A protein has these predicted regions:
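Conserved Class I S-adenosyl-L-methionine
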Residues: 264-280
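Proline-aspartate-enriched helix->loop->beta-strand connector
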Residues: 247-250
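Core alpha/beta nucleotide-donor-binding catalytic domains of modification enzymes
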Residues: 149, 156-190
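Conserved S-adenosyl-L-methionine
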Residues: 171-173, 275-284
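Short strand-turn motif at the edge of the Rossmann-like AdoMet-binding core
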Residues: 147-148, 228, 252-254
């Protein structure tokens, strides 16, 4: 008889250390609207604010000063931010909607708190560096990689102004399957910048790229990858590292119905190297029974919930949500069962909405 299927669970507290206290005035209507689709006058107001915001701060390059509070050993620091970077706006919108990548944030605070080396690939303004470096239990270091020149300036400025440079090292480069230069396609939203070998009609900037295997840095214990479809190239460039060092990997995976093979390629690449895949979800009580769902039952900074690492067979990827943060844990690496409790699993527990 085979082993009883299990998922892994742990009680966690979600923490959002960075608090944006001021955005450019044109960003106000955009942030307050959140992810809901406004109607009537609100829709017109938002549309006008959006056009002015991108026209003034994007096309014309006018300054868009904002402010963020970050905890520091000597007290809270108020640091300037570039409000033209829409990733700051998205951070505010997600927090108002209940949380910013709550499952990944909680995972890192829970698992990486003891120390180690973390690579943040596609760091943008440095949220995960700030998250880890402001955790009193974290004794490790973060290497934050960002290829887009303007976004890298925001990353470096955030880490420097927050006084976190001794814990977070910023690298102006992308990671790929080769060393050299590749075109980076940028647009209105910094979080959607992507390396694209055949940029075509899109506006592209040539950026420096390196392979994970060619970096002269401390070997990573954890790698977080958010590179808008370039995940497989990043993994291929670190094949030797993945097979030898065996870091834990978390990466964004989008289901593209037109290219299902591209969706599954990073998953196959990792499982072929002995990694176990997990879907990060939340355990919640519903009508007297336990279910596994996408949204945490309790939301916001300081909320306590039960994080669930649910097995993700590749054959079931298309049945899950379109966008997933996938956890890849080396099957031969100890530690996961020490931090999570194994619990019997059945497909009936899944609430896949």
């Amino acid at each position: 008889m085979g082993e009883t299927p299990v998922y892994l669970r742990a009680r966690v507290r979600t923490r959002y250390p960075a608090r944006i206290t001021r955005l450019p005035w044109l960003a106000g209507p955009l942030a307050s609207a959140g992810f809901a689709k406004p109607r009537g006058v609100r829709r017109l107001t938002r549309k006008l604010a959006k056009a002015l915001f991108f026209g003034l701060h994007g096309r014309l390059g006018l300054p868009a000063p904002g402010e963020m509070e970050v905890p520091a050993p000597a007290g809270v620091r108020r640091i300037p931010i570039n409000g033209a970077n829409t990733a700051f706006l998205a951070y505010v919108q997600h927090l108002e909607a209940g949380g910013y990548e709550p499952e990944v944030s909680a995972f890192f605070d829970h698992v990486a708190a003891g120390g180690g080396v973390v690579y943040d690939v596609g760091a943008n303004w440095g949220y995960y560096g700030v998250l880890l470096a402001t955790n009193p239990a974290f004794s490790g270091t973060v290497h934050a990689f960002e290829a887009a020149p303007g976004t890298y300036r925001d990353l470096e400025a955030t880490i420097d102004a927050a006084g976190l440079g001794d814990r977070v090292t910023c690298h102006r480069m992308g990671l790929s399957s080769e060393d050299g230069e590749l075109p980076l396609v940028t647009g209105r939203h910094s979080a959607l910048a992507r390396i694209e070998r055949t940029a075509g009609r899109h506006k592209a900037t040539m950026v420096s790229v390196r392979r994970l295997d060619s970096l002269d840095l401390p070997q990573p214990d954890f790698i977080k990858i958010d590179v808008e479809g370039h995940e497989l190239d990043v993994l291929k460039g670190g094949a030797r590292l993945l097979e030898g060092v065996r870091p834990v990997v978390i990466f964004e995976n989008w289901f593209d119905p037109d290219q299902p093979a591209a969706t599954l390629a990073p998953l196959n690449f990792l499982t072929e190297r002995g990694y176990d895949l997990y879907d990060l979800m939340w355990e919640a009580p519903v009508e007297g029974r336990r279910v596994l769902r996408r949204r945490p039952p309790a939301a916001g900074d300081g909320a306590e919930n039960t994080l669930a690492l649910v097995p993700l067979p590749i054959s079931e990827r298309m049945a899950r949500r379109r966008d997933l943060n996938v956890l890849a844990w080396p099957g031969d690496r100890a530690g996961i069962t020490a931090r999570f409790e194994a619990t019997p699993f059945s497909a009936e527990l899944l609430e896949l909405c």
